[in-house]
Amino acid sequence: MKTKISIAFLILLAAGIPAWAQSGTAPAASSQVTAILAGRLIDTDAGKILEHQVILIRGERIEAVGQGLAIPPGAKVVDLSKMTVLPGLIDCHTHLADGTEDNTGDPLTYLKKTSAEVAFESVPNARAMLYSGFTTVRDVGAYRALNDVAMRDAIARGDIEGPRMFVAGSYVTITGGAGALTGIAPDITLPWNLHYGEANGPWQVRQVIRKLANDGVDQIKILSSGAVLERGSNPNSQEFTLEELKAAVDEAGHFGLRVACHAHSTQGIKNAILAGVTSVEHATMIDDEGIAMAKARGTYLVMDIYDEECIEAAGKANAIPPDFLAHDANLGQIQRDNFRKAVAAGVKLAFGTDAGVCPYGTSGMQFAYMVKYGMSPMQAIQSTTSAAADLLGHTDEFGSIRPGKFADIVAVDGDPVQNVRLLENIPFVMKAGKIYKQ
């Protein structure tokens, strides 16, 4: 629905704006103040719905939230009184800076294009994520090293539209591993940015992490098992050793960086947890022992349980090689069943989709699968808001609608706690106080 915007409080009274938005003591008037009238507001910290709330925003941040807040003269009013308002969504596993979607594993995809071409191709990816309601993403690796750093900074400057990004800069991977560009003849020398994160042995791992820290990354992405969409890789295999993973976590800690670890295999998952990573990505073949370990250590799992649909569709369209489909055989259902077990066990789970496997802007499709496989709609919403902010270490900045936090706000018609599929098509998006979609 279209929002109704007015700038004069007296006009609001005459127009019949709800009484719950008119009483109370107003803060000082300011042309920078925006007032959102929320018919329903999802309190993601408490896991409950509040009725008839006013959100006062000054600049980029929320100033006050509550019933009966007066709207200062001159404020811009956004009437969402017939909608449900919730914090901007967070996808904790994306790959926005890799250009156009390509899951063929063909190394020529990267060798035919300059870094500049890939960067320009990636701009629509960021916009699609933002306009689908995701105001923050944790971008966990780019084949073109540091393209994600440049994209993050361009968004922060306002040069391009996109979500707030937390980036990894590159993949920390073994030679020929799940994060390496494979299928290249041994006498071909790759450009530096196509093998930037390769490391073998604990000291090389530390060296790579030191480089990435110097490059200004927000986190480290390391891979402890093979991958599905990678030539010559096997998701059941172990890649980095426990010793190497521990070195990564230790070195990252020196720079205040958290570690996300790709792991499909049972042992790869356990090694990642033992090493002390912040999150295990995919966690496909986690067993009961691994689930117990994750719960005991407070390790987050980020399980992309919607991707199977996109991989199958791409396979039918011959857009994915047969060996990739062989890797994927039965893994999707195994991952979903293990997701259900993790939910039942009370393991920390954060929302992440591996955006780029499925088309950018479709991350919201995963919510229905999370509910189908064990979460309540409120738990699914919390996984993409308060839990995701906790995983990122920024609960003071976003993840709930609270004074002092960024004004990252989305709204839907209807109640997503009753119908979580409403989050597949979000009609109102605000990031840091600026409306991008209404």
What is each model feature region?
Residues 150, 203-301, 329-349, 396:
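Histidine/acidic residue-rich metal-binding segments in metalloenzymes
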Residues 121-148, 161-171, 217-230, 258, ...:
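Divalent metal-dependent hydrolysis catalytic cores, especially in the metallo-beta-lactamase
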